Amino acid sequence: MTESHIDFRRAKFLISAPDIAHLDQYLPGDVGVEIAFAGRSNAGKSSALNALTEQKNLARTSKTPGRTQLINVFELDAQRRLVDLPGYGFAQVPLAMKLKWQQSLGEYLQKRACLSGVVVLMDIRHPLKDLDMQMIEWAVASEIPVLALLTKSDKLAQSAKMKTVNEVRKALVEFGDWVQVEPFSALKGTGKPKVLSILNEWCHPQWLADELENQDDAE
């Protein structure tokens, strides 16, 4: 089956849900393909989503880290969705709320069968914090590929940027092909073509092709 090119500019807001249980209620079953975006509250997740979809206000950015507490879902087409998970790890968020978020994130990664890939966004100046590693480990344990996206790469000189990229790749080498590491700048557009290529590949898993083929056969 030849992969079609997904136009990420067509992404549109679908629903918000407070946790994974409610997500199951709102969406039409655990079907199709979902690509999740996860990261610490100051990792630039909303800015990255807006840059990748070329929409200034698709994902709301906030000057207050930790404000995004909902799971926000954006539809690419009838079979494919982008999922913006709550930011994690912000110090001023109450402990009970932190624990609730972490439980929700863990449940989503471990239980969502249609999850085709996870983008873990990290500020390139502060990569691989404990919760970042936990997210990566959860995803790989569930056999979900990960893109470790080092955001705000425009904040570093080229030599420092590549040094950090290589250090992160070395730190994650134990996960093999399950984890890719790329630099990204929402401001400058650095890394955007590579990221879109990876997302496009994740939008075409073999099981979705089989699912659509079975639907055609049934008709």
From Swiss-Prot:
InterPro entries: G_ENGB_dom (IPR030393), GTP-bd (IPR006073), GTP-bd_ribosome_bio_YsxC (IPR019987), P-loop_NTPase (IPR027417). One of its GO terms (molecular function) is GTP binding. Pfam families: MMR_HSR1. Mg(2+) binds at residues 46, 68. GO terms for biological process: division septum assembly. The keyword Cell cycle applies. Its cofactor is Mg(2+). GO terms for cellular component: cytosol. Residues 31-205 form the EngB-type G domain. HAMAP family: GTPase_EngB. Belongs to the TRAFAC class TrmE-Era-EngA-EngB-Septin-like GTPase superfamily. EngB GTPase family. This is Probable GTP-binding protein EngB. The lineage of its organism: Bacteria, Pseudomonadati, Pseudomonadota, Gammaproteobacteria, Alteromonadales.
